[in-house]
Amino acid sequence: CIIHAAPYSHGSGLYMLPHVERGACQVIPASGGFDPDEVFALLRSWKGATFFFAPTMVTRLINAPGLAAADTTNLKTIVYGGAPMYAEDCLKALDLLGPKLVQIYGQGESPMTITALSRAVHTDVGHPRYHARLASVGPAQKGVEVRIADEDDNDLPLGEIGEILVRGDVVMKGYWQNEAATAESLRGGW
């Protein structure tokens, strides 16, 4: 099941689609929002529970006083995204909750499908770049190309700051009845 402690208008709403496809239950907390103690209470009743959390929600969960007494065995996965996750918080969550984390990155024009940091990457502590990988958004998904460009649309070298450009079937085809905005946003298929 998926427990919606995050807004439907963001990742939780989009991430519910694969759960609906599989006939999984959808649980809406009575508070209508995120409360760590309510999450712990819901975990007692729902096996195989998945959540979509912003990184701040993960941080609040792992720092909640109630976590020490909470039974999190029913927690299957926390998918997180929507903002950067501090590597220290990620490590603490892995230590306290076990291998339950998956990170996803998307944009409004290419929702939740650009890059991902898998459960396996989160737990591959022997990798020489383990900590750097935890601080990243992961590799591009299959069928998605990603590049970083400057203001003149030139590719930038690794490590430089620029605009994230995406190409692939997951990218929108255009803005509804707004060709000018489409032409401005989708340049050369990017």
What residues fall within each predicted segment?
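Short coil-to-beta-strand transition motifs
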Residues: 136-143
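Active-site phosphate/pyrophosphate- and oxyanion-stabilizing loops and adjacent acidic/basic residues
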Residues: 91, 135, 180
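Conserved AMP-binding/adenylation subdomain of ANL enzymes
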Residues: 1, 9-49, 64
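Alpha-helix capping/helix-boundary segments
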Residues: 57-58, 85, 171
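Gly/Ser/Thr-rich phosphate-binding loop
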Residues: 21-24, 48-53, 62-132, 145, ...
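Conserved ATP-binding/catalytic segment of the ANL
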Residues: 139, 154-159, 163-190
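AMP-binding (ANL) adenylation modules
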Residues: 6-10, 46, 106, 154-155, ...
